[in-house]
Amino acid sequence: MKDLKHLIYFENLLEDANNELVRQAQADGSIVLGYTCYHIPEVLLNVDNCISVRLRAPKTGSLDISTYYMSNYTCDYARALVERAIEGGYQFLDALIGVDACSAMNRSMEHFEVLKVNSKEKFFVTHTDMPLKVTDYYIDAYTTQMREHVLNRLTETFGVDTSD
């Protein structure tokens, strides 16, 4: 029973993507990178002074606004992210990193850019292609994608050291 209070603390952290730990890290100078899919290697997002946050939209009610911009046939997760972004729920992000794995998520990330839902001057959205198979060719292509679309963008935009 003594551990229950600790579990409640961590459970409460999941209620908001911009939780206490993220706010503290950002106050300490960290660059907050949002991502939406497990295909993005977290280890690449947590380099130098960057931290990664998997985007969620807990406590989302109506999806009416995002449904206006996206079809109601697209997945609720993609529309919930757009809804939360339009509401200003992702203003804390410094960048959004995604993959071209599903068209609904591509569409939602496109709306982050088109609707300019983040007012930070250096905010950017970037996509990477996913490998179709695990072969040397695709591993090389995926490595290039991560370097060009994620690591190099972080270095160019924020001066992040990705030399390791």
Label each region the model flagged.
Residues 1-164:
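An N-terminal assembly and electron-transfer interface module characteristic of large anaerobic redox
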